[in-house]
Amino acid sequence: ICNKFDNVKNTFFIDNEDCETTIDNEPNENIKDNNTLEDDYSKIIIAKKDKTIVGFISIYLIDESTAEICGFVLPEYRNNNIGNYLMEKLSYEMEDFYISIPVAKDNKTAPNFLRTNGYYPSTTECSMVINTDNIVEKPSSFDCSFDFKKTENENEIIFEIFKDNNNIGSCFVSIFETCGCIHNVEINEAFRGNGYSKLLLQYSLYDIKNICQNIVLHVTKENVPAYNLYKKLNFITTSEIIYYDNL
């Protein structure tokens, strides 16, 4: 969802075969009882004024249960409830489906628009980064009662932490040309709450500090322990995306 005063030239290509629904028509009823998206499902809901397309919502089918939705209204036609009409049609068309819409934190237009149409914030996803020059903890300073294992695959490294020969957790690091990306950080449930994830991450970060300049990760703010841990490890939040759901 774009900001109100975006100074951007936009070009869209719309196939007439996909334009099956307009805001002047009754919503179609192609949704099946088994909650799957069918190949004949309406791809675009369009709004016209004097035979000119002034806005639309497109539904790109990814698979039978997933779709990517894009909405746009020409700037000169905004504030005329066209977007609300389109969202109303969309909500009717997809009333049996869960819809989650990502919005940048600095977007001042989208939140009110979405709330008006029955979408409310559920989670906030943060992108975080650390420059490897800021990683100074040395493995020699770690508790010697722990063992670490490193497994290298193509473009990916797996780190594991052991205590008394028990595997208590692991994390994955994907290696790209410009950065590394930490993901799938997990401590076995019986060992959580003891600071083991911090030890695992410190070891992993120090090991890869000479491989890439920056290391990134994604975490939801609602995952308070993980979010606070990354901040303690000097990760900096670079962007936030708020997800609005049709609750």
Language model segments and positions:
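Conserved beta-strand-loop-alpha-helix junction that forms the acyl-donor binding cleft
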Residues: 100-111, 217-227, 243-247
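Conserved active-site tyrosine of GNAT-family acetyltransferases
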Residues: 110-115, 119, 230, 235
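Conserved acetyl-CoA-binding loop-helix of GNAT-fold acetyltransferases
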Residues: 79-92, 193-206, 227-228, 232
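Short amphipathic alpha-helix that is part of the acyltransferase structural core
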Residues: 1-35, 120-166
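A short, internal acetyl-CoA/4′-phosphopantetheine-binding micro-motif in the GNAT/acyltransferase core
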Residues: 70-79, 185-192, 219-220
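Glycine/small-residue-rich hydrophobic helix-like segments
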Residues: 167-214
